[in-house]
Every structure is written in structure tokens, then in C-alpha cells.
Curated annotation (Swiss-Prot):
The lineage of its organism: Bacteria, Pseudomonadati, Pseudomonadota, Gammaproteobacteria, Enterobacterales. This is Probable 4-amino-4-deoxy-L-arabinose-phosphoundecaprenol flippase subunit ArnF. The keyword Transmembrane helix applies. Its main location: membrane. It is a multi-pass membrane protein. Heterodimer of ArnE and ArnF. The keyword Ion transport does not apply. Keywords: Cell inner membrane, Cell membrane, Lipid A biosynthesis, Lipid biosynthesis, Lipid metabolism, Lipopolysaccharide biosynthesis, Membrane, Transmembrane, Transmembrane helix, Transport. It comes from Escherichia coli (strain 55989 / EAEC). Residues 1-2, 57-76, 122-128 are cytoplasmic. One of its GO terms (biological process) is lipid A biosynthetic process. Belongs to the ArnF family.
């Protein structure tokens, strides 16, 4: 059950991160504070996506809380690294994100996935 809550947390946090990235790239920069505040108060699509991203992080924290009650901390924190993989893949697949593929990033993803496999795959008992 803890693994399920952890996966929910990772997926929700990844979607929230993508939402916040979208909002940050479409809202006026905070260096133009009055324009930024006006865009928030107009509550257009960009501001709504910003709010959804923030609410997504809040929901992700609730799922993370449930995860920590059911799953060992060493496994739970390792699970968070999947968010990097999901966001990287989504940025390349989703239209308008312009995520770039590189061998360096692919090597990083391979390291993350290898580490997760080492942590989560069942260990065989050795007889001496």
C-alpha cells in the first residue's frame, strides 16, 4: 500500500511540476510585479494552471505523508527520483515543451532506473 501512495505522490508531483513550469513560462516575470499581479487577478488560463500546480503539490504532500507511514524511508526517498524521469520524458513528448534529448540525460535516467531496480527488486537469499 505504501508503494501505491508513493507512486501517486510521484505522478502528482510530476504533473504539478509541469503545470508550474507551464505557468511560469506564460505568466509575466515577477520582476514586473504589477503585470504579474494583474495576470493573477485576471485568473486566466495561466493563473489557473499555476493554482492547479500548487494544489497538485499539496495533494502530493498528502500522498507522501501516507507513503512514509507504510513504506521504509530508504525505499520512499528512492522512489522520488522517478519524478525526474517522468518530467524529462513528458517535456520531450508533450507539444510545446521543447524538451531536448541528450545522451547525458539518458545516462542519468539509466542510472536512476538502475538504482531503483537495485532497491526495489527482491533479493535472493544466499546459502553458505
Amino acid at each position: 500500500m505504501g508503494l501505491m501512495w508513493g507512486l501517486f505522490s510521484v505522478i502528482i508531483a510530476s504533473v504539478a511540476q509541469l503545470s508550474l513550469g507551464f505557468a511560469a513560462s506564460h505568466l509575466p516575470p515577477m520582476t514586473h510585479l504589477w503585470d504579474f499581479i494583474a495576470a493573477l487577478l485576471a485568473f486566466g488560463l495561466d493563473a489557473r494552471i499555476l493554482l492547479l500546480g500548487l494544489l497538485g503539490y499539496l495533494l502530493s504532500v498528502f500522498c507522501w505523508y501516507k507513503t512514509l507511514h507504510k513504506l521504509a524511508l530508504s525505499k520512499a526517498y528512492a522512489l522520488l527520483s522517478m519524478s525526474y524521469v517522468l518530467v524529462w520524458i513528458a517535456s520531450m513528448v508533450l507539444p510545446g515543451w521543447e524538451g531536448t534529448f541528450s545522451l547525458k540525460a539518458l545516462l542519468g535516467v539509466a542510472c536512476i532506473m538502475s538504482g531503483l531496480m537495485l532497491i526495489f527488486l527482491p533479493m535472493t537469499k544466499q546459502r553458505y
